[in-house]
């Protein structure tokens, strides 16, 4: 049985988010194919996540023990490390993703939990895990220098040791003349297909 962490980062309501229409379809199909797996949904806008402050640094760099697992910040890092698979759903905002997702990544980027420092440099601790990034974008950003969200996520997940990463991108949703409903449906089809083997 696998533990799946479904991270959602969009301030829009469920029915309004084009990203969530695709990611929720992915999750539903995954459940059908993996009924024994545990799926934990983490809607970042419903969590008490903020930008790190000076007082938080002691928690991040302090002792990692049983008591620290209940820490208001470190609990997210432990939860992240405990998962086997990750579904990260976030739209492209200003060539990246919503700032709350970066704030969350700062919460889970903790030495001794998701990576460690060695004499040879940092080493990821989350090996043999997999992730999928589901993103909706207003324009066409495949292989574009303006695309920094998916590129960053792949880099930081790789830093944690996660190498098996897929991306489902629904592009050109804000381009005049594009059939948005059709584009989203294409994204859902891709999501369902990938969920069967994730």
UniProtKB/Swiss-Prot annotation:
Function: Quinone reductase that provides resistance to thiol-specific stress caused by electrophilic quinones.
Record text on subunit structure and interactions: Homodimer.
Cofactor remark: Binds 1 FMN per subunit.
Entry GO MF terms: electron transfer activity; FMN binding; oxidoreductase activity, acting on NAD(P)H as acceptor; oxidoreductase activity, acting on NAD(P)H, quinone or similar compound as acceptor
HAMAP family in alphabetical order: Azoreductase_type1
Residues reported in the UniProt entry to bind FMN: 136-139
Superkingdom of this protein's organism: Bacteria
Keywords, alphabetical: Flavoprotein, FMN, NAD, Oxidoreductase
Gene behind the chain: azoR2
Protein name: FMN-dependent NADH:quinone oxidoreductase 2
EC number: 1.6.5.-, 1.7.1.17
Family membership: Belongs to the azoreductase type 1 family.
Record's keyword annotation contains DNA repair: no
Cofactor(s) required for function per UniProt: FMN
């Amino acid at each position: 049985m696998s533990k799946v962490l479904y991270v959602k980062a969009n301030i829009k309501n469920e029915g309004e988010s084009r990203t969530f229409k695709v990611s929720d379809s992915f999750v539903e199909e995954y459940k059908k194919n993996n009924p024994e797996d545990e799926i934990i949904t983490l809607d970042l806008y419903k969590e008490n996540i903020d930008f790190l402050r000076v007082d938080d640094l002691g928690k991040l760099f302090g002792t990692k023990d049983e008591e620290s697992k209940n820490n208001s910040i470190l609990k997210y890092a432990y939860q992240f490390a405990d998962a086997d698979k990750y579904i990260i759903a976030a739209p492209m905002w200003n060539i990246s993703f919503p700032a709350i997702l970066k704030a969350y990544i700062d919460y889970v980027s903790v030495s001794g939990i998701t990576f460690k420092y060695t004499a040879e440099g940092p080493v990821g601790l989350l090996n043999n895990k997999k992730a999928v990034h589901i993103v909706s974008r207003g324009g066409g950003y495949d292989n574009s220098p303006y695309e920094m969200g998916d590129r960053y996520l792949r880099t930081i997940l790789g830093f944690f040791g996660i190498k098996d990463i897929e991306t489902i991108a629904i592009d050109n949703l804000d381009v005049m003349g594009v059939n948005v409903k059709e584009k989203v449906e294409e994204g859902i089809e891709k999501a369902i297909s990938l969920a069967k083997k994730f």
